[in-house]
């Protein structure tokens, strides 16, 4: 008697119809992460330089941030996204490149805001590097 396999039914991602959203760009010295959300903060799509196959010091380049923003924008535009508010966080080199590639992908940028956390003299910073 043949044993029958249980077939798992995969649900397809439903296409949300969202016209305006937010793009959160986190650009550090090591990597760049782009998350596109709706106005409430629910993620529509995300992409990172490391997730696209960039390794080591190539993750922190402006080109890697550009590719990450492009990939996130394309998948978000499948949900009907047309315009975004951009929130940039971090001191990395991919900040401007990511914003430019969001515009090049066809999203209308309505606002650019820097939300980098700045301490009001909080924790003691790590000791200086001696190279």
Curated annotation (Swiss-Prot):
Origin: domain of life: Bacteria
Q: Does the keyword rRNA-binding apply?
A: yes
Cellular component terms (Gene Ontology): ribonucleoprotein complex; ribosome
Q: Which UniProt keywords apply?
A: Ribonucleoprotein, Ribosomal protein, RNA-binding, rRNA-binding
**Biological processes annotated in GO:** translation
Q: Which InterPro entries match?
A: Ribosomal_uS11, Ribosomal_uS11_bac-type, Ribosomal_uS11_CS, Ribosomal_uS11_sf
Q: Which cysteines are joined by disulfide bonds?
A: none
In its UniProt record, a GO molecular function of this protein is: structural constituent of ribosome
Presence of keyword tRNA-binding: no
Assembly = Part of the 30S ribosomal subunit. Interacts with proteins S7 and S18. Binds to IF-3.
* Assigned protein family: Belongs to the universal ribosomal protein uS11 family.
Role noted for this protein: Located on the platform of the 30S subunit, it bridges several disparate RNA helices of the 16S rRNA. Forms part of the Shine-Dalgarno cleft in the 70S ribosome.
The name under which this protein is listed is Small ribosomal subunit protein uS11
């Amino acid at each position: 008697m043949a044993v029958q396999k249980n077939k798992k039914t995969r649900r397809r991602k439903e296409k949300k119809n969202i016209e305006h959203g937010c793009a959160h760009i986190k650009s550090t010295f090591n990597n760049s992460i782009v998350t596109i959300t709706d106005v409430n903060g629910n993620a529509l799509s995300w992409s990172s330089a490391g997730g696209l196959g960039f390794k080591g010091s190539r993750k922190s380049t402006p080109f890697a941030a550009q590719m990450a923003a492009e990939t996130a924008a394309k998948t978000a535009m499948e949900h009907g996204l047309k315009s975004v508010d951009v929130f940039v966080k971090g001191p990395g080199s991919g900040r401007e490149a990511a914003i430019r590639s969001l515009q090049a992908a066809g999203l209308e940028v309505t606002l650019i805001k820097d939300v980098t956390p700045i301490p009001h003299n909080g924790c003691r910073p790590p000791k200086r590097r001696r190279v």
